[in-house]
Amino acid sequence: MPLAMHIVLWTLGAVAVLLFLVYLIGGYFMYRVAIRRDDKRQNKCWELPMSKRDSESDEDFARMKEGEAFVKGRLAEFVTITARDGLKLTARVFEHPEARGMFVMVHGYRSSSLGDFSGAVKPVYDMGYSLFLIDQRGHGRSEGKNVCFGAFERYDVVDWANYIKQRWPGLPVVMDGVSMGSGTVMLGCGVGYPDNVKAIIADCGYTTPGAICRSVLHKHMHLPTFPIYYGGRLWKKLLAKYDIDKISATDALKKLSDKSLYPHPIPILIAHGHKDGFVPYAMSEENIKSLEDKDGNLLPFAEFFTSEEADHGMSFMKDYDGYMAAIGRLFDKAGLPHDKVEEPAFVPETPVSELTRDDADTGMIYTIN
């Protein structure tokens, strides 16, 4: 064999070995960074005072701090369930004295329910709804070594809805998810919610876990999807026991029109900010197509809301009035009340001035964590 051919074959072999190593090592890196539980990188809003991000205006942050003080000034009931794979999952419940329903707030990736819903907790409570703030598996007080992008979490939210049905019979439930939480509540549609779930809100969710992982690899980590993404997919299959490309929120939403699963479709609101720099706005445009008829019109039980100025998860803050109006239309379809409930002013056990201090000693002032 000519020397040149030997060189070509050796070069091709070396490239193949290199690609295989990148496939395995880069994929494992992706698994460790994206999937494995990492409490150091997670949102610490329950333990520490909230801090302002560059994308938040002073007005937005003031509303978020008000929500933080509103929740942290109350004592929570901690409730737990056992997931279908044996993990213990935890939620905090803040019951309204004259509850019209229960808002299940499902947070996003490496976040917390308080971090993602601080701007919404008080308006929701003021409508007469109890707050049910869950810790997704792999986050907070819930067990779990992996974050699964809805693969297992979709069953968790259905099980939480069943828990509420048993604990509070007849109480309507609203499933409300942001980012990965949005993907979770949409994927739950494909599992089958119990009949106490009367409405769903899905804010800035993705189409599939695989699609958002590829997008983040390319746009934010500046890494090639091949071979790293596919190596990561292999490690997820081996170690986390799910296939990131076999799960689709777009497909799950189609189940809302399945009469065998939902004799009466659950009204749903899809929301997304145009300036979302993390989950592409186009993903919600694709998801909403699952809720259109053959002529491209939204099905009667669906709502779509967008804010021109909102970044990731900020539509509620950037267009509060428009978002609340969309919730009102959603609730009208669901037969749920949404007018404000008057009640005596609540005085937190801990003064609000203390709860919102930047140098707050969390061990001394917080009533819950």
Regions found by a protein language model. Give the residues of each.
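An N-terminal hydrophobic leader/cap segment in hydrolases
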Residues: G13-T82, V341-P344
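Catalytic nucleophile-loop/oxyanion-hole region of alpha/beta-hydrolase
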Residues: R110-S113, H139-W168, P172
